[in-house]
UniProtKB/Swiss-Prot annotation:
GO cellular component, one term: cytoplasm
Binding site for ATP: 11, 59, 87, 93, 104, 114
Keywords (A to Z) from UniProt: ATP-binding, Cytoplasm, Kinase, Magnesium, Metal-binding, Nucleotide metabolism, Nucleotide-binding, Phosphoprotein, Transferase
Lineage of source species: Bacteria, Bacillati, Cyanobacteriota, Cyanophyceae, Synechococcales
Protein name per UniProt: Nucleoside diphosphate kinase
Amino acid sequence: MAMERTFVAIKPDGVQRGLVGEILGRFERKGFKLVGLKQVTPSRDLAGEHYGVHRERPFFAGLVDFITSGPVIAMVWEGDGVIASARKLIGATKPLDAEPGTIRGDLAVNIGRNVIHGSDGPDTAQFEINLWFSAEELNAWTPSDQSWRIES
């Protein structure tokens, strides 16, 4: 059975605040498989493509400035229902609206510094994965405990 994949990025504020391990751990404990991981300071071109849907919005320039201000941890996670589940783990875009127990609910306060990005649907996930990763950077592998996490 082919598993779904999603793109997740820990933004510069999450990296600077030392939250990478905490965030990775939440996805791993949930049972998702990490198939792509890299640290990169995005170029303005990459940021512009990533946030292209917001190009005409007044906050676009600030978004690009912020995401290019420092290192980002770009990840691809794989698992059954990973896109929707990742969105639940991440929490509402506005941290003050995010439920306690979510990444943003526990670790963020301000919408402009909300720590993490996650794809919002299958088409977006595929676009973002292809934008940030080459096929060679993604690893197909089988965790030794897979039968304990996923019913066949």
